[in-house]
Amino acid sequence: AAATKDFNCRMAEYAKAVVDGRPNFHISLVVDISPNCDCHFENDAPILPNIGMFASFDPLALDQACVDACLKQTPLPNSQLTDAMAKEGFCDHHDHFENTTPNAEYKTCLEHAEKIGIGSRDYELITIS
């Protein structure tokens, strides 16, 4: 777990190196939300429905808004997540990502990003239909 937390902190630091002092705008398409990082070759079917597009000048607010939107969704049936939830002894973390990959420690990245000044986890969500 310590190595994962360290990796997530480094990821935030590398992101800061890219955006610090430069104008930037970020767009996230929250679709085909897989159980593992997109970089994993062994990925499975999406665990959540497609949510939409998010955009912000603050990359951290954007990430937090995307996470929050995902956590409000009902997991897709017959996905790795719902299969795990149906198993006897399932430990519900009340977080789709922690339920799918408990050791990912994704919140560490967001917390560290805020601590080092990439942006704020606070946001105002404006919905456009």
Briefly describe each language-model feature range:
Residues 1-129:
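Extended, low-polarity segments enriched in aliphatic/aromatic residues
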